[in-house]
């Protein structure tokens, strides 16, 4: 009986993992409409599974997800392209839950250059800069 319960629990956990991964890695948590976000980079991470920026903007500090590093680096946005203290302008999608200061960026404009970190996604807004 214990062995059966353990197997059932493991099977349910295995089924739940892909759903959790899709919730984080997908776009369902974001608004459909594109928007802009500008501010100053507080920190930037070029690690897997997604690059990440903490961005100080007028309404607070935002958590910004970008593409996986390999995709961003193909656009030219890799280590050295941006650093803490740089001003940045983003286009992308904010969280559907407006209590969260969370944003998923499609383009990053920093130091006079625009990087399309999600080149496969259609875009309605043109980057500023």
Regions found by a protein language model. Name each.
Residues 47-56:
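Short aromatic-glycine-enriched beta-strand elements
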Residues 95-119:
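OB-fold/S1-family single-stranded nucleic acid-binding modules
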Residues 21-35:
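Short boundary/loop segments of OB/S1/cold-shock single-stranded nucleic-acid-binding domains
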Residues 115-129:
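Extended, charge-rich, solvent-exposed interface segments
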Residues 39-41:
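Conserved hydrophobic positions within beta-strands
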Residues 1-10:
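Bacterial N-terminal signal peptides that target proteins for export
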Residues 74-90:
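Short nucleic-acid-contacting surface segments enriched for D/E, G, S/T with interspersed K/R
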């Amino acid at each position: 009986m214990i062995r059966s319960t353990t197997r059932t629990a493991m099977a349910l956990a295995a089924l739940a993992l892909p759903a959790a991964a899709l919730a984080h890695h997908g776009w369902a948590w974001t608004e459909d409409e594109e928007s802009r976000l500008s501010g100053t980079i507080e920190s930037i991470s070029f690690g897997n599974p997604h690059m990440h920026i903490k961005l100080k903007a007028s309404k607070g500090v935002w958590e910004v997800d970008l593409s996986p590093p390999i995709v961003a680096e193909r656009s030219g946005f890799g280590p050295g392209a941006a650093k803490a203290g740089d001003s940045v302008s983003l286009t992308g999608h904010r969280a559907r839950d407006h209590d969260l200061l969370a944003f998923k960026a499609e383009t990053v404009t920093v130091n006079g250059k625009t990087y399309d970190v999600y080149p496969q996604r259609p875009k309605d807004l043109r980057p500023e800069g």
